[in-house]
Swiss-Prot record:
NCBIfam families assigned to the protein according to its UniProt record, in alphabetical order: PRK03598.1
Annotated localization: Periplasm
UniProt keyword Coiled coil, yes or no: yes
Main localisation: periplasm
Entry keywords, A to Z: Coiled coil, Periplasm, Signal
Cellular component aspect of the GO annotation: periplasmic space
Entry-linked HAMAP family: UPF0194
Record-given protein name: UPF0194 membrane protein YbhG
């Protein structure tokens, strides 16, 4: 009879130990937080001129640090300077033509057109009278049919000249047609667009660094004739520094955008970098081969981009990084 209470007591002790152990294990997981493994993202860009031409000079070499806005190289500017001058001249011509269309015709031009009408009218009247006389002579068989035809032809030519002079005077007095003005305006806008393109081409004959980085390769040398878009430099971008890591679905709720994390490298295991999750992929993917966590290699995972907020030159691209979640990392 005494054994039963003893057994019950032992069971209670064992159960309490299990509960305590489970609680301790749970707390230890909460305290340690989630640990992920990733790498510093490799970010490179190929730099090229947007226009073609002969390379005039290159200002940097492999291994050089470059700054955003720095001049890296130049093409021969002369062809683009000439094209710019031609485009400016084209705008001047088109502007002058458009201004003439808007202004209409001068009084002197209208007076000259009116005088031309009078002169053409007189010539037509003479040709008509001459033709009438020739008709009478032909009826009396005094002249040949060929003479009559010549008189008719002269009359018709004088009539056409008169009509042309009258149309010209009418146009001068009414001004230019709206269609002609619109065409002149379109020609001006086209010339202005060509000028803008020429200015852009000249600007693009100088290669400017888009951001800070380190020059990895220099693909050409001065004197090389390049097509537009031909690679000149390959640059490793140094800012901002991103870490790429992967998280499985059951831990996805801990890896939300804005979450702060600690980043450890082998070179400084006791002095972590600080980072913040900037992006979480909306779609799952099979774990890449580069992921070093064995229990994730066969899982579907979500890619994270972590922005390092206190990066320095010791954090190199491709370097393995341990990502630590926990209370010490904090939240946004």
């Amino acid at each position: 009879m005494m054994k039963k209470p003893v057994v019950i007591g032992l069971a209670v002790v064992v159960l309490a130990a299990v509960v305590a152990g489970g609680y301790w294990w749970y707390q230890s997981r909460q305290d340690n937080g989630l640990t992920l493994y990733g790498n510093v993202d490799i970010r490179t860009v190929n730099l090229s001129f947007r226009v073609g031409g002969r390379v005039e000079s290159l200002a940097v070499d492999e291994g050089d640090a470059i700054k955003a806005g720095q001049v890296l190289g130049e093409l021969d500017h002369k062809p683009y300077e000439i094209a710019l001058m031609q485009a400016k001249a084209g705008v001047s011509v088109a502007q002058a033509q458009y201004d003439l269309m808007l202004a209409g015709y001068r009084d002197e031009e209208i007076a000259q057109a009116a005088a031309a009408v009078k002169q053409a009218q007189a010539a037509y009247d003479y040709a008509q009278n001459f033709y009438n006389r020739q008709q009478g002579l032909w009826k009396s068989r005094t002249i040949s049919a060929n003479d009559l035809e010549n008189a008719r032809s002269s009359r018709d030519q004088a009539q056409a000249t008169l009509k042309s002079a009258q149309d010209k005077l009418r146009q001068y007095r009414s001004g230019n047609r709206e269609q002609d003005i619109a065409q002149a305006k379109a020609s001006l806008e086209q010339a202005q667009a060509q000028l803008a393109q020429a200015e852009l081409n000249l600007q693009d004959s100088t290669l400017i660094a888009p951001s800070d980085g380190t020059l990895l390769t220099r693909a050409v040398e001065p004197g090389t004739v390049l097509n537009e878009g031909g690679t000149v430099f390959t640059v490793s971008l140094t800012r901002p520094v991103w870490v790429r890591a992967y998280v499985d679905e059951r831990n996805l709720d801990q890896a939300q955008p804005g979450r702060k994390v600690l980043l450890y490298t082998d070179g400084r295991p006791n002095k972590p970098y600080h980072g913040q999750i900037g992006f979480v992929s909306p779609t799952a993917e099979f774990t890449p081969k580069t992921v070093e966590t064995p229990d994730l290699r066969t899982d579907l995972v979500y890619r994270l981009r972590i922005v390092v907020t206190d990066a320095d030159d010791a954090l190199r691209q491709g370097m393995p990084v341990t990502v630590q979640f926990g209370d010490e990392a904090g939240h946004e």
